[in-house]
């Protein structure tokens, strides 16, 4: 056979001879039979076999077919009517209506037989709906459309096995099952049996109601889902319709103006209950309020006038904090001014370089001036317990004055420096008389002649009069646990340390033939982080503490610091010898320990403490002897 001539523009479908050549010659099997008309031959074979052996058969698209179905209904109609997708999409809603009303509603779904005739007595086959939706019979997303299947890799094999079983069971149309089997019962049970690891579907294409497919859900293992499937894959952000409540602050702090922190009422009450006795708050508040009233000119007395005059002197010595002070006015004009109280109110109208400090109290009422960070968001109140910078560590203190003005800062700074220099003098005969100290200091600074000069080796005039901004800062509020439990444990350790130090001192003095140490240990104080242990003592002569420090370091393995109390104020006789509250408290603890079999030594509660307030007593006595 000669093939017709073709070129690049020739189409096989347009050339009849070329098409016949491919149909009759090329499409043949090994036996030489043509393969071009296989569909037609198969139809003829089925017609002959059906006529010879009429029996039921299975169609994998339309379900079970009986022998009464004619062949024309199967193959004669090429445009077979099928149920629409929207009809199957409403199946869940129709079934819910029927379950609620107790009867079937007006059906809008029709099943079509092979001849295209709709019938209402046959329910739409659920497997058709699942095939269209590409899901399993129990609402499990198949691996083809489930983008989140990677989150449940352990259950994929189980889901595939369930799908295969459902497909095998779905070969027979449930609409033609035996009458004694309830289709509603079968399908209802299959629909309600959700697997434990099923993936949720969306409702009405609303992406904000449930978790999207691309995010794993922790609660999908416990919830059941029977809502219609959303064919649209959701990748939009999830809108939380029920946001969680704002977490409560376990530290008991309250937010002010959205950025500042302050102690709540409950936390502040806890501060007052735990810190009042330990930090001698009553005596400290009384002393500071008295000084503030004197500096304002509220008190009219000789001592108050001397305090105000000395305050003006301190201002003149700190021009960097007070550029518009009276130092810019001539001495004659300054002396011709009004009374001291009025001059104190009007002399400092502006302090350009001064930033308010914070006045705090340590154990037994020892005062400290601190600075606040420039970016601090803490709103402090009197009585708050805060964590501050300590000596190479952290410490816990009581807030006395949240905002200290320049007048109070200058006066408190002078008192602290005076106490420091006095504590370094071991021989009481070397102290300069306190009743003459202020006048001598002022005259020496102004260049006037004095009867007795201050010893520059014992007193540094510049350091006495100059206010230096402290480097230690307020860090944060103390937590409830730090204010109660940790502070109580700290006090209990301090009682034991006081007892051990006195035992060590007694042992060293007994073994020393030269007389030993002539000191009296008044108190012990741990830094809050236990990195430093300070012992406060008083003595009348110079002593060598190296052996005592070695013994204490062997026991505590921390830095040991011995701090002297000025011996020219009779602090031990006025605030310690007649009371010794802490020493008696420790003796009482040990007596209960000897009678108790539990082996636990517990100090009294913080709100029941009564301590030796000798630290604030030092400030009170110093003001009295200097300006009284």
Swiss-Prot record:
Phosphothreonine sites (modified residues): 235
Q: Which residues carry this modification: N-acetylmethionine?
A: 1
Q: What are the alphabetically sorted keywords of the record?
A: Acetylation, Cytoplasm, Phosphoprotein
Listed PROSITE patterns = PSP1_C (PS51411)
Acetylation recorded as keyword: yes
Task: Give the top-rank taxon of the lineage listed in the UniProt record for this protein.
Answer: Eukaryota
Single Gene Ontology MF annotation: mRNA binding
Q: Which family does it belong to?
A: Belongs to the PSP1 family.
**Additional free-text comment from the UniProt record:** Present with 1550 molecules/cell in log phase SD medium.
- What name is this protein filed under? Uncharacterized protein YLR177W
